[in-house]
């Protein structure tokens, strides 16, 4: 299960993480975001312990979304050591996100 990001845990869960973090920026009203939800949940299970998978509701944390330039949702941003290393906009196939994670883990 993906970690739900809040104003109180963003720094700890994402910016200070010792392992890479995939963050799904989404909203309840966003149809493509809902399509991506099962993909995000599968990635969380498959990469447990290797990559942290998180969900951030842009309606609740619009300041964080703005901080990272999120203009469209869903947007998936991958962080490593507190820095953005990849970003994908739109409801993309699981294989694309898995490929990004695999490439990152191979570094």
Can you name each region flagged by the protein language model?
Residues 1-52, 60-107:
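Proteins that catalyze or organize thiol-disulfide redox chemistry
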Residues 55:
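Conserved residues in the N-terminal Rossmann fold of short-chain dehydrogenase/reductase
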């Amino acid at each position: 299960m993906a970690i739900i990001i809040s104003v109180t845990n963003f720094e700890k869960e994402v910016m200070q993480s010792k392992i890479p973090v995939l963050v799904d920026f989404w909203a309840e009203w966003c149809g493509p975001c809902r399509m991506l939800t099962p993909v995000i949940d599968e990635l969380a299970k498959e990469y447990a312990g290797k990559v942290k998978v998180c969900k951030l509701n842009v309606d609740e944390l619009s300041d964080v979304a703005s901080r990272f330039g999120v203009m469209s949702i869903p947007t998936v941003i991958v962080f490593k050591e507190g820095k953005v290393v990849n970003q994908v906009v739109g409801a993309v196939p699981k294989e694309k996100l898995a490929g990004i994670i695999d490439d990152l883990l191979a570094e």
